[in-house]
Amino acid sequence: IGQRFSHVISDAGAHVVLVDIQEKSNKKLENELKSRYHTNPSSFKIDITKKHDVMELQKLVLKKYKKVDILVNNAHSIPRTHPKRDAPFEDYPLELWDEAISSNLRGIFLCSQEFGKVMLKQKKGVIINISSIYGMVGPDQRIYGKSRFDSPAFYSATKGAVVNLTRYLAAYWHQKNIRVNTLTLGGVFDSNLHKNKNFVKNYSNKTIIGRMGKKEDFDGALLFLASDASEYVTGSNIVVDGGWTAW
């Protein structure tokens, strides 16, 4: 979804700064944006859980662009290869919990802290924190069958924390012309991940719209929050979930 957001913002004329620890794919996306939209994107290999890295990123961005209009905190980590990543809650490894808390919360904290300083000096800025419906409600284990919910307890815990960190920052920076909002996403269909037709059917039946989300379903909400169209919106949680949380 981060790649999709990069395209959407670039298409609107923004010079996007891509931040990831995966250098090769990040550079590929940078070149793609540059070629398609004729903007001036950049990509940096940065570990957002390390304060020094984020401080360096701030310096690099300011050196090239002189300002920061929008910060989208979209990064999160779900351990994929650990042998116990799917362990039940009662036996879930503490090291995986700590790893997820670090990437899913510490990264947002550090990026908001360092780029919030820039926005304070500019006297203007927008921060958009990406969360999930499972930061609002518990996952319905019944739709996952024997495999259980694919993303363990830390996912719900950190995504819920994102929503309230947004509210805190919006209130903290009141009257500073820095707007902070959450964009909460419903489940997004991915043909590479969602090969279980029963899961897709069960998930779709729990939404009012009757299907899983498509990546483009979130374009409008992202552009709304990033633009002056939402200048009277801060501390809000914009939920785009096909009606999942409405009943």
Annotate the PLM regions:
Residues 117, 171-172, 231:
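Alpha-helical segment proximal to the catalytic Tyr-Lys
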Residues 69, 77, 90-110, 124, ...:
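Catalytic Tyr-X3-Lys loop
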Residues 86, 146, 223, 234-247:
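Short C-terminal tail/terminal secondary-structure segment
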Residues 174, 179, 233-235:
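Short, small/polar-rich loop/turn modules that mediate ligand/substrate recognition or access, typified
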Residues 81, 94-96, 128-161, 166-175:
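Catalytic loop of short-chain dehydrogenase/reductase
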Residues 207-218, 229:
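A conserved structural motif in NAD(P)-dependent oxidoreductases
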Residues 56-63, 82-91, 95-102:
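Active-site Tyr-X3-Lys motif and surrounding loop/helix of classical short-chain dehydrogenase/reductase
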Residues 1-17, 169:
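Canonical Rossmann dinucleotide-binding motif of NAD(H)/NADP(H)-dependent dehydrogenases/reductases
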